[in-house]
């Protein structure tokens, strides 16, 4: 008799989820051609032109801030869509909860706006 019969499928899926990446990387290492130590192959490719300067440049933080604000509001849409589809069944309590959620996001948007995260100069 198994110790935890309810979790047999969970453990099977967990084992499969761990084995698939290991197998994929192993097969890739076996099938991939060997890499040579040629310095020409390890240079940065810039449309056939010799690279100028370093390949690592520092990006400004505003790109990341802009992307972060976008992701936050994109995820908000993902959360609001199921609520909107079942609005009739949920009632006034769910409406109040979503209203609080949207107010918190609006406060965050105002904060980001005042900090200058949305300015592009």
Swiss-Prot record:
GO terms for cellular component: chloroplast thylakoid membrane; NADH dehydrogenase complex
InterPro entries according to UniProt:
NAD(P)H_OxRDtase_bac/plastid (IPR023043), NADH_UbQ/plastoQ_OxRdtase_su3 (IPR000440), NDAH_ubi_oxred_su3_sf (IPR038430)
What keywords were assigned to this record?
Chloroplast, Membrane, NAD, NADP, Plastid, Plastoquinone, Quinone, Thylakoid, Translocase, Transmembrane, Transmembrane helix, Transport
GO terms classed as biological process = photosynthesis, light reaction
Q: What is its EC number?
A: 7.1.1.-
> What stretches pass through the bilayer?
10-30, 65-85, 90-110
Q: In which compartments does the protein localize?
A: Plastid, Chloroplast thylakoid membrane
**Chief location:** plastid
Write out the catalysed reaction.
a plastoquinone + NADH + (n+1) H(+)(in) = a plastoquinol + NAD(+) + n H(+)(out); a plastoquinone + NADPH + (n+1) H(+)(in) = a plastoquinol + NADP(+) + n H(+)(out)
Tell me how this protein assembles. Answer: NDH is composed of at least 16 different subunits, 5 of which are encoded in the nucleus.
> What does the UniProt function comment say about this protein?
NDH shuttles electrons from NAD(P)H:plastoquinone, via FMN and iron-sulfur (Fe-S) centers, to quinones in the photosynthetic chain and possibly in a chloroplast respiratory chain. The immediate electron acceptor for the enzyme in this species is believed to be plastoquinone. Couples the redox reaction to proton translocation, and thus conserves the redox energy in a proton gradient.
Output this protein's name. Answer: NAD(P)H-quinone oxidoreductase subunit 3, chloroplastic
Protein species of origin = Staurastrum punctulatum (Green alga)
Highest classification ranks of the organism: Eukaryota, Viridiplantae, Streptophyta, Zygnematophyceae, Zygnematophycidae
**Gene field:** ndhC
């Amino acid at each position: 008799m198994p110790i935890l019969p309810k979790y047999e499928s969970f453990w099977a899926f967990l084992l499969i989820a761990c084995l698939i990446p290991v197998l994929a990387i192993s097969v890739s290492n076996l099938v991939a051609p060997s890499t040579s130590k040629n310095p020409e192959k390890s240079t940065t490719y810039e449309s056939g032109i010799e690279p100028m300067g370093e390949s690592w440049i520092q990006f400004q933080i505003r790109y990341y801030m802009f992307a972060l604000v976008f992701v936050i509001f994109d995820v908000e849409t993902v959360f609001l869509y199921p609520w909107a589809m079942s609005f009739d069944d949920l009632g006034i309590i769910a409406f109040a909860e979503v209203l609080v959620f949207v107010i918190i996001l609006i406060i965050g948007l105002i904060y980001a706006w005042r900090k200058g995260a949305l300015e592009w100069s």
